[in-house]
Amino acid sequence: MKRLLFIAAAVIAIASPAAYAQVVRGDQIIAQSNFVNRQQAAIPQISIVVRADFVLFSVRYETATRSADARENELAQTFTTVTQRAARTQDITVEVGQPGVSAAIETAAIKELIQARGDDRSGIDIVLKVMVKSNETFDAVRARAEKFVKDAPLTGRVEAIIGDSQFLGVSEPKKHRETLIKAISEDVRLMQASFGGPASPVQVSLTGMEQRAQTRPVGPLDLEIYIPYSMSLRSGAGQ
């Protein structure tokens, strides 16, 4: 009998300087899709909205079998089943850990992944990375994740628990940064043309351009990406 539970999981996230739950890795940017922040964050004028390339779901497998050795065996067998199933499933991959602090399954031994939860429960955390298909809705993406978890056979008393927090992600953030820089450059030229002239040139100064691109969710599968820069104008030719 399949045991699939949906609960409010504890959120493990990294807050970005812009006050949104965000994780930046070299090859991707991840933002928590249902993160709510009461603080007002200043968003620069220039930004772009892109569709998420993937969604991350946290899944916890737990067992309450009496024997600790039996619990470890159940979780090890379940983990093998899940990872092998993911290898055969298109557009779904598995990592160990939590969104933003996950790693490839090859980087850790199963004994290192199993965590004791009290005296009579043990568990293991994984991350499902589900690629977003063309014209797919968020509900459709989540349905695929839920089906993957539901259809994976479980060993012994293992239960599957899907967290209620998801992370939207974009791959290759470098290409989006290049798009932003070009747009900001055009905005600088517009400022100079609008407020200056041959007799009174305008100097435009930018600060913060060295920072990494930031994101915030603006739709079920949409992310706004921006560089947290600031702009200042000064009239006169260096005066």
Spans of features found by a protein language model:
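N-terminal signal peptide c-region/cleavage motif recognized by signal peptidases
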Residues: 14-18
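Sec-dependent N-terminal signal peptides
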Residues: 4-13
